[in-house]
Amino acid sequence: MKLLLSKPRGFCAGVERAIETVEKALLLWGSPIYVKHEIVHNRHVVQGLKTKGAIFIEDVEDVPVGARLIYSAHGVSPAVREQAKKRQLIEIDATCGLVTRVHSAVKRYALQGYQIILIGHHNHVEIIGTAGEAPDVTTIVESVEDVKNLNFSSQDKLFYITQTTLSLDDVKEITQALIVKYPHVETLPSSSICYATTNRQMALREITDLTDLVLVVGDPQSSNSNRLREAASTRGIESYLINDEKEIHPEWLLGKQVIGLTAGASTPEEIVQKCIQCLIELGVNEVEDIVYTHEDVVFQLPKPIVNARFSVD
């Protein structure tokens, strides 16, 4: 039985920056450090940071006045930032730079009088934060059916933008429907789907046609991990989303010749390696890397972390 490893996979630059932000904050100022929402959507990462002293909260009111609060990679709305200021919290922003780009675009176009069409999943924390930049003029669209139900006129100035972790195929269908209905709709010159989401989906496509089973290592809450599993499934390949090696079912491998393995952008490589070892113990006797592209993107740590490190040095 052969195992094909999709590359790139696992951590992206935004996730690495967010995790390092929490770790460095704990080293610089000690516990507790408060984090708004899970820093990234992966239970192994979150649990590891909890044991080091990070406290994850959903409501800013749960943070003691004057404490340090880190914003997760998914971003937050201006209302959350205002709430933090009222509590005199020391804010450390670990929002992914690519999410910040989307926030900035929504704010800019809203100020210019546009109606914002935000393509994404209604309940995802990234979408909640982005929509909060201009809640009165933002409409969230999740499907082609949602596009059909839009009631804008040809006189309305329209701008669309997407959640950074969506399926390339889904976005293509939705944007095509949007452009057909509203030919005058505007968007950014380049896609707002992040490079890592795109690379992981394209890398997976390189192996799906060669496999009879695809395993995606990622948390059920992780949007990009779910989109990876869907990408394989829509191509008719049996596929499963697993948290770690403990969720691999031996019966999945019965009769299989080639297995594909990838991981979402918030999945640690050590978890992937445990999954590989488990598959070897279950009968895999050949492992091959299939490389789509190499990534060398690095995002600078938030200024409060950088400045504190320099002052300590």
From Swiss-Prot:
Xref: Gene3D superfamilies: 3.40.50.11270, 4-hydroxy-3-methylbut-2-enyl diphosphate reductase, catalytic domain
Molecular functions (GO terms): 4 iron, 4 sulfur cluster binding; 4-hydroxy-3-methylbut-2-enyl diphosphate reductase activity; metal ion binding
One GO BP annotation of this record: dimethylallyl diphosphate biosynthetic process
Keyword vocabulary terms for this entry: 4Fe-4S, Iron, Iron-sulfur, Isoprene biosynthesis, Metal-binding, Oxidoreductase
InterPro entries: LytB/IspH (IPR003451)
EC numbers: 1.17.7.4
Pfam families xref list: LYTB
Matching HAMAP family: IspH
Family per similarity comment: Belongs to the IspH family.
Protein name (Swiss-Prot/TrEMBL): 4-hydroxy-3-methylbut-2-enyl diphosphate reductase
Organism of derivation: Protochlamydia amoebophila (strain UWE25)
Name of the coding gene: ispH
